[in-house]
Amino acid sequence: NEEKAYKKLDLNPDDFRIDILAPIKRGWKSSGVGFFIGKQGNLLTASPSIMGSNKIRVRFSNGRTEPVKLVQKFIVYKIAILKLENPNKELPKPLVFEDTPHFKEDNTVYAMDFLKLQTPNPSLSKGKILKENALENSDKIVQLDLAVQKGQSGGPLFNNDGNVIGLILEKSLAQKSFSYLKDAPANASFAIKS
């Protein structure tokens, strides 16, 4: 019942069809997902999706592509902030961050299935929080029971209100940065808390 989930979270499938980092011509390669934050044309993504790139473009759901530049990269947490080179053009609606996100074990969370963005209604994946603090020495990483496929790192993690509470990292990517996560269950994924 994706329609019910979209309605409950006050979301629209088109809110997600805009944020694919994708090729625009031969030689370009699609490498990840991201989402707009704020009204200045900034995007969040997982930094490995732009690793080794000299030029980066985003492709919107209507096929339009725009160049972006790297603003900041947070190496430890695998986060990159990108900015549209021409933010004066019409921008998609940015996602709303939860002011005071709560992370409690067994709380329900949602993620967009970015692998199915070519369909008119991309699906939402529903999961739950397994560990509020997945690392002993940091309160920034949450462990999830949520299906996250390769290439979906950099997408938003939503709460029941449809607000962003984190940035999703697939298991293998999170484990490369944090050795404590090596023993995570097979179905686990992770998120950087917002």
Predicted features, each with a name:
Residues 55-58, 174-192:
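A short, polar/charged loop-to-alpha-helix boundary motif
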Residues 90-141, 148-153, 168-181:
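Flexible, gly/ser-rich surface segments that form the specificity/activation loops bordering the active-site cleft
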Residues 31, 38-89, 104:
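Catalytic-histidine neighborhood of serine endopeptidases
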Residues 37-39, 71-73, 132-133, 160, ...:
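Residue-level recognition of beta-strand microenvironments
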Residues 34, 41, 45, 68, ...:
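Terminal peptide-recognition signature
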Residues 24, 39, 61, 82-90, ...:
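A structural micro-motif recognizing beta-strand termini
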Residues 18-40, 46, 64-67, 154, ...:
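A conserved glycine-rich beta-strand in the N-terminal activation segment of trypsin-fold
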Residues 1-29:
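Protease-domain processing segments flanking chymotrypsin-fold serine proteases, especially trypsin-like
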